[in-house]
Design a protein with these regions (language model features):
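Outer-membrane beta-barrel domain signature
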Residues: 15, 32-36, 74-78, 116-120, ...
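Membrane-embedded beta-strands of outer-membrane beta-barrel proteins
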Residues: 26, 45-47, 87-89, 103, ...
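Predominantly the C-terminal beta-signal and adjacent terminal strand-loop region
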Residues: 133-169
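Residues that define the transmembrane beta-barrel architecture of outer-membrane proteins
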Residues: 22, 39-43, 79-85, 99, ...
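Gram-negative (and chloroplast) outer-membrane scaffold detector with strong preference
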Residues: 54-136, 140
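Outer-membrane beta-barrel pore domains and translocons
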Residues: 29-33, 62-64, 106-110, 147-151
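N-terminal signal peptide c-region/cleavage motif recognized by signal peptidases
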Residues: 3-5
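Short glycine/proline- and aromatic-enriched beta-strand/turn motifs that initiate or cap beta-hairpins
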Residues: 7-57, 169
Length: 169
């Protein structure tokens, strides 16, 4: 079978992408939250593909950076470890303005264990949030946001889904 270039434009699922600005980003994230009723810090990062300065498809992942006792587990000297990540979908509102907003949702999975890994559990996570964004330069933006982490399926010692769910800033 021989092929020849077609003279007409080829139809594609996303259409003519040459008319749409797109690029990528990545960066660190620090979140202040609560785990099992105690102050906690999550550190991690997120990145994605920015489509037409309005929509982001990406991913993110976060891990517990503070020490917490593993409630309900009879293992001395072991701390709780937790992490989660997933797909991020984000809508950016008025990205050309000095200060603008975005709204996002992370949908994914996480895990909780002890420092020695003697017990472990996996869970579902959904984390909607909003951010206030500041354009520092054309290629550098800083965001300040709030989110709520919903977890489901947690059965780890005396911890349940409510203990790992919570607001974050």
């Amino acid at each position: 079978v021989l092929g020849a270039p077609a003279l007409a434009d080829e139809n594609t699922l996303l259409g003519d992408m040459s008319e749409i600005d797109h690029g990528g980003f990545g960066g660190p994230v620090v979140k202040f939250t609560q785990v099992d009723g105690a102050f906690a810090v999550l550190s991690g990062g997120k990145g994605g593909w920015i489509i037409d300065h309005r929509f982001v498809v990406g991913g993110g992942g976060y891990g517990l950076a503070t020490r917490h006792k593993a409630k309900g587990l009879e293992v001395s000297g072991q701390d709780l470890e937790m992490g989660y990540g997933g797909l991020i979908l984000e809508a950016i509102i008025a990205s050309d303005q000095l200060i603008h907003f975005s709204t996002e949702v992370l949908i994914g999975a996480g895990g909780v264990t002890t420092t020695r890994g003697s017990e472990e559990d996996a869970f579902f996570v959904a984390e909607p949030g909003v951010s206030l964004m500041l354009n520092i330069t054309k290629f550098f933006r800083m965001g300040f946001g709030a989110s709520y982490r919903y977890t489901a399926g947690v059965n780890f010692g005396d911890l349940d889904s409510g203990d790992l769910s919570g607001g974050a800033a």
